[in-house]
Amino acid sequence: VVTKIVGQKAYLLCLACETDFVAQNAEYTASANAMLEVAVKNDAADRDALMASKNDEGHTVEEMVTEKSGQTGEKIELAYYARIEAPYCAAYVHFNKKLGTILGFNKEIPAEVAHTVTMQATAMAPVSISEADCPAEVVEHERKIAVEAMKQDPKNANKPEAILEKI
């Protein structure tokens, strides 16, 4: 995973391979960064647009991926690409370079706070941005866990379940 922030836009690219041996190779990382630079230069809106975008030599990202696959002898693929736009953007890539997150904020926040929030989003793997976007079965599952936890609290021992569900 590689990321880049340019002004009010953040870009994230995940180039997948089969082994850690290839993934930890500096040349492989350089290739991922080169593809990310193509994304930034062309301001690619989505994965399909990025795959069709060309570098300065006239090669598409799709061709770059195929070439890298031939060089390494492994199946290489552009597993994920995202671009966001917000007044303030932050990015985090986990130390193993296998996980990363880009976030947009509607106002500027201290860099340390942005870093911490982005790191936590990466670690927690959220399923949605808000409860409204969350699948109903996930909300119900989490609600059941919360009610069970409240039942275990001695302070709630005498409260009816109907009341616990409203807390």
Where are these regions (language model features)?
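N-terminal assembly/interaction segments in proteins that build large macromolecular machines
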Residues: 1-167
